[in-house]
A protein has these predicted regions:
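Bacterial N-terminal signal peptides
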Residues: 12-23
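Bacterial N-terminal signal peptides that target proteins for export
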Residues: 2-14
Length: 400
């Protein structure tokens, strides 16, 4: 591109590099759930403040005079991942050395990597304390760069299997209660199966029933494997963002269905789907409308939408660009074909160094997403050699 090029791209939700950590699975011989050595709560209900960034819920915690530490909550992961630095600070009985202490983990999109085993002596979330937590060690630097904030780990579903876990997306909080508590849970229960260490529920798609993973660690909305289903499309599949996974990157294919999705008593009309060849899943872009409660003692999940009205229609706002983020610059990783960005001549490899005049290091993902909610054009500054070129961008709906 030259400095005179017009760059009309997206306004709205950022089509950024999304790290799909959900769906992490262990080999079959390790699928028996391994809860922490002991879980204690300061009361019958522990409320942990949470934050939503890129459709992912994360929490912040401090204990033993150290922290704050930040963790993503990933119900789609059968393991808990932490950085080597955190494992060194709170070493447990399992140390990451010696034979047979590496495990192969398969990510949501089928790729696999080997990670060292270890354990944490203690992990606290507000008034909840977990002791002798088995973990795998993972470098969270790429995820930290994407979210624009330090990430110290990913909390998998088995960590909470001794608890009644509520992800209150609208209220930006986690609620932890004893699993034996006879609590009144809002919403309609959906039978669940956590035999493989992660929660699977049956949902309705049109006139069919479909088994899906409830995956808070996926930033997507509804990931659908169309094999054997022959879904009807209101808007046919098209290219979306470039998605980062635990084992690499893949291009996204998105579509809008012509039939509703039913979660218990909740009906989502014409849902947006991210097409996959792996297990179908409900991710953060859909779950964020609900208060989701996992009741492992009774094998059920509740979906409750606070307030009046039906679930809102799912939308996909896009800039036509995917970025790989660093504190100093954002590199264009991919351009969606047929988007305004592609028409403007933007190509992968170009570097963005400022947003609205501020260095990109000041823009975490949550702040950038809030900016994209508005209607005002956004000024991106590109670095071309030693020259800086400003471009004002707007946004479009990826799927009508």
């Amino acid at each position: 591109m030259t400095s005179g090029d017009a760059r009309r791209v997206a306004r709205g939700a950022w089509c950024a590099l999304v790290f799909l950590l959900g769906g992490c699975a262990l080999p079959p011989f390790l699928r028996e759930p391994v809860p922490p050595g002991r879980v204690t709560l300061a009361g019958t209900e522990v409320v942990v403040p949470a934050r939503l960034a890129g459709n992912l819920l994360w929490v912040e915690a401090s204990w033993e005079g150290a922290g704050p530490f930040r963790f993503l909550v990933d119900t789609g992961s059968s393991v808990t991942l932490v950085t080597p630095a955190l494992a060194q600070r709170f070493p447990g009985r399992v140390r990451p050395s010696g034979p047979n202490l590496r495990l192969r983990v398969r990510g949501a999109e089928g790729g696999a990597i080997d990670l060292p085993r270890a354990s944490l002596r203690r992990l606290e979330l507000g008034g909840a304390a977990f002791e002798e937590v088995e973990v795998l060690l993972y470098d969270c630097a790429p995820l930290s760069a994407h979210l624009g904030l330090p990430v110290d780990g990913v909390l998998g579903f088995p960590l909470f299997r001794e608890l009644l876990l509520t992800l209150d997306y609208p209220g930006s909080r986690l609620i932890l209660r004893p699993r034996t508590l006879s609590a009144v849970i809002p919403g309609q229960p959906v039978p669940a199966d956590a035999a493989l260490r992660t929660p699977l529920v049956t949902v309705g798609l049109g006139e069919r029933s479909l088994l899906v993973l409830v995956d808070s660690g996926s930033a997507a909305g509804f990931s659908l494997n169309p094999a054997g289903i022959s879904p009807r499309y209101a808007v046919p599949p098209r290219d979306g963002a470039l998605l980062g996974t635990l084992a690499g990157e893949r291009p996204q294919r998105v579509a809008r269905l012509a039939e509703p999705l039913r979660l218990g008593g909740q009906v989502i009309p014409e849902p947006v789907v991210d097409l996959t060849d792996e297990l179908s899943a409900l991710g953060g872009a859909l779950l964020r409308q609900f208060v989701v409660t996992f009741d492992p003692a009774r094998d059920r999940v509740f979906f409750h939408r606070p307030g009046e009205g039906a679930p809102v229609r799912m939308e996909v706002r896009s800039s036509g660009l995917s970025f790989t983020r660093t504190p100093a610059y954002w590199r264009v990783a991919a351009v969606i074909p047929g988007s305004p960005a592609a028409a403007a001549g933007i190509v992968p490899g170009e570097l963005v160094v400022r947003v609205n005049g501020e260095p990109v290091g000041r823009w975490d993902l949550a702040r950038f997403e809030r900016l994209l909610e508005g209607s005002e054009p956004i000024t991106l500054t590109f670095l071309e050699g030693s020259t800086e070129v400003e471009a004002r961008i707007a946004a479009f709906n990826l799927l009508p």
